[in-house]
Amino acid sequence: MKIGIIPGAGGTQRWARTAGKVRAMEAVLTGEPVRAVDAERMGLVNRVVPAGAQLEEAKRLAQQIATRPPLAVRLGKEAVNHAMEVGLAPGLEFERKLFYLLFASEDKREGMRAFLEKRPGRFTGR
């Protein structure tokens, strides 16, 4: 804004959807930078880590996700991404279909067995 343009690359659209219209409007019209702690509070970022620790934290998160059932991870990503493109009713219908698909998967059976046997699951993505 301070240099005669608005945020591009979807900035105005994503900001309004994530932080709300009022916060997005203030940020877009003033052009003032947002502090990391405020970005976290508004939901623009999911966590703030100390400077220099970003890669380590990203790897830790990736390793955690890698232990989860791959089919459920993939379909979970699809469900959340789909939610951003449609209204609530179609989003719930899409989620229900994915849930039923996962409920019939080998990974779900393995996950339930592993839980009952108090051991980590051995997931195959099927």
Predicted regions and their residues:
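Crotonase-fold acyl-CoA enzyme core
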Residues: M1-V73, L101-S105, E110-R113, E117-R119, ...
